[in-house]
Design a protein with these regions (language model features):
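Catalytic, metal-anchored helix/loop core of enzyme active sites in primary metabolism
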Residues: 1-384
Length: 384
């Protein structure tokens, strides 16, 4: 039996991870969880799974949960803040950590978990975007497996199994194109948060839904793929595939292309990561090839969707430029959702930050966290 912690248990990936645990009740024990504000759902999870440790990152929610746990006689330790996140990620009794928190907050607990020798089921792509060099070095030094949960990176990971890494010609990273595929810049001027949140294929949280609509999500995935698979940026090609059936592909030097196909259901890559190297029973509907009428592929429109282009530029420049890109994007998404900026201002402000801040510094936890704070403060003061 594997013992696990889930960081971000009440979010989209966290709740779907719980679905996997319900399906494999005999295979996993949930030891620790973290959440932010959703105390009602957190209480339901505590009652169902009986985790020993619960970390809450929002102060008022933490106080409320402490009172609820005590009044109902539940046996779990409730911890507050970043200290709590790190504790849940580094518990002696766990084998693997599912990092499904959204954004920069996942970086420190992930790095500390790696240093404690915990395998990582990685759904928090920002961790590799801002500190990929550090994270992969620490993973290698500590003998830790980084198992991708993103459907695209899981597909690449599976397509690499049993093949020589040095025979890769290129990675083909698929994208649905999001809800605004085919739109012009003029079309995007009137985009509202409500429209941007409606993804055509995937059930996701708010932040990743906006990122998918701007193609920034794909840009972050390009940087993530660079670090996960030690692949140069010039050999990572984004392919728009609206049907979301092929989750990504690897082309080898002999011309062969190996792809992973499946229904668009995040429980599949979650299940694969948690059970690796084994494959377990089918948690989702199986792909019926006879129901697929067509599989189509397009090049992304980098002029209209500038975020993807900016992500490639940030990745190529390296050092702390991806930290600037990521921090600026997180704040811009927040401001857009709160209707403080327009949709087209998102790439404009990100590019402004990339041209404003010094990125040519060593990638350390200290430097990443400090620069991230500077970027966020700059945008809040100017645009909020």
């Amino acid at each position: 039996m594997k013992r696990i912690s889930i960081l971000g248990v009440t979010g989209s990936i966290g709740t779907q991870t719980l679905d996997v645990l319900r399906f494999h009740k005999e295979d996993f024990e949930l030891v620790g969880i973290t959440a932010n504000r959703n105390i009602e759902l957190t209480m339901d999870i505590i009652k169902e799974f009986s985790p020993k440790y619960v970390a809450i990152n929002h102060e008022e929610s933490y106080k409320k949960l402490v009172d609820l746990v005590k009044s109902q006689g539940l046996k779990c330790e409730v911890i507050y803040g970043m200290e709590g996140l790190v504790k849940v990620a580094t518990l002696d009794e766990i084998d693997i950590v599912v990092t499904s928190v959204v954004g920069m907050i996942g970086l420190k607990p992930t790095v500390e978990a790696i240093r404690k020798g915990k395998d990582i089921a990685l759904a928090n792509k920002e961790t590799l975007v801002v500190a990929g060099e550090l994270v992969m070095r620490e993973a290698k030094e500590n003998g830790v497996k980084i198992l991708p949960v993103d459907s695209e990176h899981s597909a690449i990971f599976q397509s690499l199994q049993g093949n020589a890494h040095n025979k890769i010609d290129k990675i083909l990273l698929t994208a649905s194109g999001g809800p605004f595929r085919g739109f012009t810049i003029d079309d995007l001027k009137s985009v509202t948060p409500e429209r941007a949140l409606k993804h055509p294929k995937w059930n996701m949280g708010q932040k990743i839904s906006i990122d998918s609509s701007t193609l920034m999500n794909k840009g972050l995935e390009v940087i993530e793929a660079h670090w996960l698979f030690d692949c140069p940026y010039k050999d990572i090609e984004v392919v728009v595939h609206p049907q979301s059936i092929i989750h990504s592909m690897v082309q080898y030097t002999d011309g062969a292309v190996i792809a992973q196909l499946g229904v668009p259901d995040m429980k599949l890559p979650i299940q694969y990561a948690l059970n690796y190297p084994n494959r377990q029973g089918n948690i989702s509907e199986k792909l019926d090839l006879f129901k697929i009428r067509e599989l189509t592929f397009e090049k992304p429109d980098l002029d209209t969707f500038k975020c993807l282009k900016l992500a490639y530029e940030a990745g190529e420049k390296g050092k702390l430029m991806p930290t600037i890109l990521n921090g600026a994007n997180e704040v811009c998404v927040e401001l857009f959702l709160n209707k403080k900026i327009t949709y087209l201002q998102i790439p404009e402000i990100i590019e402004e930050c990339m041209n404003t801040f010094d990125y040519n510094k060593e990638v350390t936890l200290h430097n990443v966290i400090n620069l991230d704070k500077e970027v966020r403060q700059y945008i809040y003061e100017k645009y909020n």
